[in-house]
Amino acid sequence: MKTAIFTVVLALAVFAVLSFGWEANEKALSEESTELIHEKEAASETEARECRYFWGECHDHMPCCDWLVCRYKWPITYNICVWNRTFPEK
């Protein structure tokens, strides 16, 4: 009886140590993937951004293309790029 209880307690201790190791490995992997995502976002922010096309959402940091202008249009609750009644030069 004592041997069976000792075996069960020993098995539980081994499982606790193994699960702690797996959890630590999973946490490290999660932190690593988060760092990679942040690096990718930072790299994309430094690149030149394209202009916003017709009916695209626009702000000061998201300009419209040359032949469009950023305007507020009701009932849409944000600014959109609309045609400024000019044609782009070829």
UniProtKB/Swiss-Prot annotation:
Expression across tissues: Expressed by the venom gland.
Predominant place of localization: secreted
Cellular localisation: Secreted
Keywords: Disulfide bond, Ion channel impairing toxin, Knottin, Secreted, Signal, Toxin
GO cellular component: extracellular region
A GO molecular-function descriptor: toxin activity
UniProt signal peptide: 1-19
SUPFAM superfamilies found in the cross-reference section: omega toxin-like
Chain residues in the propeptide: 20-50
S-S bridge residues: C51-C65, C58-C70, C64-C81
Keyword set includes Cell inner membrane: no
Coiled-coil regions listed in the entry: none
Any single Pfam family the record assigns to this protein: Toxin_12
Keyword ATP-binding on entry: no
Function: Ion channel inhibitor.
Domains (record comment): The presence of a 'disulfide through disulfide knot' structurally defines this protein as a knottin.
Protein name per the record: U7-theraphotoxin-Hhn1a 5
